[in-house]
Amino acid sequence: MEMKTHYIDGAMYIGCSEEHFTTYNPANGEPLANIKQANQSDMEAAIESAKRGFEVWSAMTAIERSRILNKAVAILRERNDELAALEVADTGKPIQEAIAVDITTGADVIEYYAGLAPSLQGEQQPLNENQFFYTRREPLGICAGIGAWNYPIQIAMWKSAPALAAGNAMIFKPSEETPLTALKLAEIYSEAGLPDGVFNVVQGDYRVGQMLTAHPDIAKVSFTGESGTGKVVMGDSAKTLKQVTMELGGKSPLIVFDDAKLDDAVSAAMVANFYTQGEVCTNGTRVFVHESIYDDFVAQLKTRTEKLVVGDPLDENTQIGALISKEHESKVLSAIESAKASGATLLTGGYKVTDNGLQNGNFVAPTVFIDCDDSMSHVQQEIFGPVMSVLKFSEEAEVIERANDTDYGLAAGVFTQNLSRAHRVIHKIQAGICWVNAWGDSPAEMPVGGYKQSGIGRENGVETLKHYTQTKSVLVQLSDFESPYA
């Protein structure tokens, strides 16, 4: 079996460690590759490479950096389908999703920041006839990106794009579950002309993350993952006063009012729960439906959910793919059993799919529970699988209070034809990413991130680029300096 390793100093890096692990295809359980586990010596090699790369990259003009990033965008788009197929093998998601979204939206973000890079500027202000000051936005240095396994290459692009556009170097650690496409991204960056060492990839488990958060030469850590892990990463980073961005978990509400377009609302609920087989941090897993349309909503939801195609992720007709691992599949199935035991009514799904040659994969049927109560564990806890909870509500004030009754605050959505109500409700919802009569779109221009336990900082948008810089203030004296000392 092929041995995959790290990408350091513009090339594949064999590394010093003899330890390795195997990554598997979630759809059939077959091994994909053996992966080298980085040790401290490998990490030091990545750090030294990043230092050298940073000196070259940060000295280039913003226009020069922009041109190189745009070359990478062109290569990514040219190889979209090839990269999508590898992403499917790594993640188990349907090929129709990977082709349309994963590489495309990541490339969009790189292109966006390539355009923004030349706009980074400081300010100048006169103080009096003898003094003025100016500011410079300077790169932080070496930044670390720690990725998740649901959108591996997209996350690598989302994290690297603003970091590189601002003149930083990055060391990226993909999830050990999905280590392959980050290596392809590194190769593409090099092919586009990125100086050696500016984007490095180190492979491994949580120990590599600990090396990154502990290393004094890392200036910033951007992490995507589960909230509990994020707190550990943030705590470790604080010991050396690293800047952090945390994109964490959620238990997001989708609110459907009585005047909503029913077809659209059902479509959104399905996207918000079954896209990428439910392995999306922004999933709207708590679907609140007004009592007057509840029965019609549930009836249409059942009919349409049962038509979804669960199957081979490489089949273009497949709509629901495989969960990332056997362990995660077991966790999702356990949550389903807990929901049944709690008294919720299983509307559809709720089982492992094994027919049509899927017995060796990690497939769970799209699942919907009705007659749910806010206190039930499956309503409160993030499941990260294709499991939807439908809840009934009567009044606007009531549903706002219930929607906010969670430790999370990542996303929220409202479906209504009443524009005043839409804005009024969204303004009261405690969530960082909100949609009105839509769900899931996340354009490069829009900053995304969570409230409460769902994160700190933002990905995408103008403000994220600024967070990969530090401000230097320079005061200039035009006249003789007057000392208070003789």
UniProtKB/Swiss-Prot annotation:
Binds 2 potassium ions per subunit. The modification Cysteine sulfenic acid (-SOH) is found at residue 281. GO terms for molecular function: betaine-aldehyde dehydrogenase (NAD+) activity; metal ion binding. K(+) 2 binds at residues 241, 452, 455. K(+) 1 binds at residues 23, 90. Keywords: Metal-binding, NAD, NADP, Oxidation, Oxidoreductase, Potassium. NAD(+) binds at residues 147-149, 173-176, 226-229, 249, 281, 382. Its EC number is 1.2.1.8. InterPro entries: Ald_DH/histidinol_DH, Ald_DH_C, Ald_DH_CS_CYS, Ald_DH_CS_GLU, Ald_DH_N, Aldehyde_DH_dom, BADH. The active site is at residues 159, 247, 281, 459. Pfam families: Aldedh. Its cofactor is K(+). It comes from the Bacteria. Pathway: Amine and polyamine biosynthesis; betaine biosynthesis via choline pathway; betaine from betaine aldehyde: step 1/1. It is an enzyme of class 1 (oxidoreductase). Dimer of dimers. Involved in the biosynthesis of the osmoprotectant glycine betaine. Catalyzes the irreversible oxidation of betaine aldehyde to the corresponding acid. Belongs to the aldehyde dehydrogenase family. NCBIfam families: BADH, PRK13252.1. This is Betaine aldehyde dehydrogenase. It comes from Vibrio parahaemolyticus serotype O3:K6 (strain RIMD 2210633). The lineage of its organism: Bacteria, Pseudomonadati, Pseudomonadota, Gammaproteobacteria, Vibrionales. The gene is betB.
